UniProtKB/Swiss-Prot annotation:
Disulfide bonds: none annotated. Required for the formation of a threonylcarbamoyl group on adenosine at position 37 (t(6)A37) in tRNAs that read codons beginning with adenine. Is involved in the transfer of the threonylcarbamoyl moiety of threonylcarbamoyl-AMP (TC-AMP) to the N6 group of A37, together with TsaE and TsaB. TsaD likely plays a direct catalytic role in this reaction. This is tRNA N6-adenosine threonylcarbamoyltransferase. It comes from Baumannia cicadellinicola subsp. Homalodisca coagulata. It catalyses: L-threonylcarbamoyladenylate + adenosine(37) in tRNA = N(6)-L-threonylcarbamoyladenosine(37) in tRNA + AMP + H(+). One of its GO terms (biological process) is tRNA threonylcarbamoyladenosine modification. Belongs to the KAE1 / TsaD family. It comes from the Bacteria.
């Protein structure tokens, strides 16, 4: 079965085609980062308008690269939420319209389920059960995954998501949007230990996170520190170390609490190399396994949507009616139906 996947939940336009026999055939991504850089963040109106401009050319490019025609597509999957409603509507309406025109079924896919299952596209995918750490610009969650579609929320951020904290701290340091990757880059030149940042909510029990206070701590530190490049690198290093330490402590607790022996990292922040290296070392020292997707499948993309759509089509477990275009800007992951596979 070949499924066309469409992703437009925020500011990246993604189109991909997944074949359940031959794997990922094509993965087209267009980033709007340059458009939003002047505003220091995503402007929803600009995002949706640019999705409209790019989505059809990307679909054409995907079909061309895969050497397929519309008649070769067996289903269309699109991101229905969570996300920006104006952006979601672009992908949803185009996806449903194509499915209607091509006389194939369409399916609404949960954006975070896409991220969570993106490592399944790798040569060595994880087996169940596992603990998933979902870290992105909008989410920071720990989830117990016992099978496809069966998710239990263990903990989440009570305020800012980790990716949001990265971007806001980067902005305080004068870095361009999106600042998270740039902060990580200058952190590599930072001197460890020059600044000591707190590890929020690690001294109390539980698996919830809080990053708003860490961002405030960074702001106060920046305000009283020198403004030279080395000082900024040292602050970036202290911030990143604090974030990574916090995530590691919570992941260890989640693994201990569930008794699972596998950790999956997903979402845009999971591409952070410092996080990957330190989490990998920690998990392997425990005698356990860690999994994550290649960097281009960590950020928003159509490949993860096409894959989840393929799995749900095959199981005949659909999360919504096929007769209407429905988007859900807020959509708890736990509401999804278990996939029988």
């Amino acid at each position: 079965m070949r499924v066309l996947g469409i992703e437009t939940s925020c500011d990246d336009t993604g189109v991909a085609i997944y074949d359940d026999q031959h794997g990922l055939l094509t993965n087209q991504i267009y980033s709007q980062a340059k458009i939003h850089a002047n505003y220091g963040g995503v402007v929803p109106e600009l995002a949706s308008r640019d999705h409209l401009r790019k989505i059809v050319p990307l679909i054409q490019a995907a079909l061309s690269e895969a050497r397929l025609q519309a008649k070769n597509i067996d289903g269309v999957a699109y991101t229905a939420g969570p996300g920006l409603i104006s952006s979601l509507m672009v992908g949803a309406t185009v996806g449903c319209a194509l499915a209607y025109a091509w006389k194939v079924p369409n399916i609404a896919v949960h954006h975070m389920e896409g991220h969570l299952l993106a490592p399944m596209l790798e040569i060595n995918p994880p087996s169940f059960p596992f603990v998933a750490l979902l870290v992105s610009g909008a989410h920071t969650q720990l989830i117990a995954v016992t099978k496809m579609g069966k998710y239990q929320l263990l903990g989440q951020s009570v305020d800012d998501a980790v990716g949001e904290a990265f971007d806001k701290t980067a902005k305080l340091l004068g870095l361009d949007y999106p600042g998270g990757p740039m902060l990580s880059k200058i952190a590599q030149q930072g001197i460890a230990g020059r600044y000591k940042f707190p590890r929020p909510m690690t001294e109390r029990p539980g698996l919830n996170f809080s990053f708003a206070g860490l961002k405030t701590f960074a702001a106060n530190t920046i305000n009283i520190a020198a403004s030279d490049a080395q000082t900024h690198a040292d602050i970036a290093r202290a911030f990143e170390d604090a974030v990574v330490d916090t995530l590691m402590i919570k992941c260890q607790r989640a693994l201990d609490q569930t008794g699972f022996k596998r950790l999956v990292m997903a979402g845009g922040v999971s591409a952070n190399q410092t996080l990957r290296n330190r989490m990998k070392k920690m998990v392997e020292q425990r005698g356990e396994e860690i999994f994550y997707a290649r960097p281009e499948l960590c950020t928003d993309n159509g490949a993860m949507i096409a894959y989840v759509g393929s799995v749900r089509f095959a199981s005949l477990v659909l999360p919504q009616s096929q007769l209407a275009v429905i988007v859900r800007p807020r959509w708890p992951l736990e509401e999804l139906t278990t996939i029988s596979r």
